[in-house]
Amino acid sequence: ALAYALAPSLKGKIEAQTAAAEKRAAEMRAWLAERPSKPGEHRAFWCHSARGLGGDRDWDASIRFLKENGFNAVIPNLAWGGVAFYSSQVLPVAADVATKGDAFAQCRAACRKYGVKMHVWKVCWNMGSHTSKAFEDQMAAAGRTQVDAKGRALRRWLCPSHPANQQLEIDAMVELAKKGADGVHFDYIRYPGGESCFCAGCRARFEAALGHAVTNWPGAVYGAKATLKREWTRFRTGNISRVVETVATRVRREAPGVQVSAALFRNPASDPETVAQDWPAWCRAGWLDFACHMDYVESAAMFRSQVRTQMEAVGKKVKLYPGIGLSCWENDGTDGVRLAKQIEAVRELGLGGFTVFNFDRRAERVLPLLRTGVTRED
C-alpha cells in the first residue's frame, strides 16, 4: 500500500524533471540559433582517426557531414613517428592499408569532392601504438629512441637530436606535401617534457656543440643544480626548430602553395624550456602559415586571455586559428554553448578562424546545433 501511495508522487517528480530538461534543451537550441555566423573564416576540425568518424561513416561520409555543418577544413592524423596510413616511401605503412585502403587517397578524394581543405596531421617523434614492434626494435637497437633522466628507455619516442630521426620527420612531411595535400600539419613537434632526452647520443652531440666534455650527466643540464641549463635549452630547441625550418623551406620550394602549420602548446614563456617548442621564434621567422595553439579550457574568459597572450607572442607574420577543446570538456550537454562562446571569442579578437578537437561521435552530436547559428552558411 505504501509503494502504491508513493508511485504517483515519484511519477510526477520524473515527469517534472523531464519537462525541465526539455525546456533547458529548447532554450539552448534557441540561444544557439540566434548566434551570428561569419562567412569566409577558416573552420577546421582535427581528426585523430585515420579513417574519419568510423562506424558507418567512411571518409566520404565524414567529410560530407563536416561540410554540411559549415566547416571547410579537416586535419586528419594520417602519420606518426613510425607509421603511415598511406603508401609511403619514407615511413613504414600501417598493416590496415592492405585491407582498408590508402587513407590519404580516400580523404583527399572526399575533400576535393566537397570543397574541404585537407591539412595532413603528422605526429612527430612519437611512434604511436600502430607502429610495428619490428620497427620499434630497429630504432632502439640503432640508438634512435629516447632515454629519460633516470636512464629509462622511452621506446616509442624517437630522439630529436639524432640526425637520422630529424631527416625522417623532414622527409615524411615533404612527401605528404608532394602527394597533393593542401597543407602539412606538425603535432608533437617537441620533446615529451623536460625529463628527456638524455641518451648517449644526446650527450655526445651536446658535448660537440659545447666544445668540451660534460662530466656530471645529466645533473649538469637537468635538475635544481644544473649549471648548463641555458645551453641545454638552446640545444634542445635547436633540434626541434631545425626540423620546422627545413620543412618550411623545402615545402615552399618543392610543393609551392602547400601550407605548413602546427598544433602548439600555449605558454610562450615556458614552452621553449619545458618541451623545447620555441614557437614564438618559428612564427616571427614566418616558418608557419598558421598556428593552432591547443587552448583546451572550458572557460571562455580564460580561453580569450590565452589567445590574446599568444597573439602578442606571434606577431603579424602567421595566422592564428586557436584550438578549441570540445572533446576535452565535461560532457554535460552544454558543450554546444561552450563551443559557440569560444568561437565568438575568436571573432571578437579579430582572428580569421579556429580549429576544434576532435572530430568524433561527440562532434556528430554538437555540429548540427552549431549549424543553426555560428557555422550557418547563409
Which sequence ranges carry the predicted segments?
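Glycoside hydrolase catalytic-domain groove-lining segments
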Residues: 207-332
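Active-site-adjacent "subsite" loops/lids of carbohydrate-active enzymes
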Residues: 40-43, 52, 120-179
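Aromatic- and acidic-residue-enriched segments that line the glycan-binding/catalytic groove
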Residues: 87-97, 126-152, 188-223
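Substrate-binding cleft of secreted/luminal carbohydrate-active enzymes
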Residues: 287-303, 310, 318-378
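Catalytic domains of carbohydrate-active enzymes, especially glycoside hydrolases
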Residues: 57-84, 178-183, 287-291, 348-353
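Aromatic-lined substrate-binding rim segments of carbohydrate-active enzymes
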Residues: 63, 80-123, 235-254
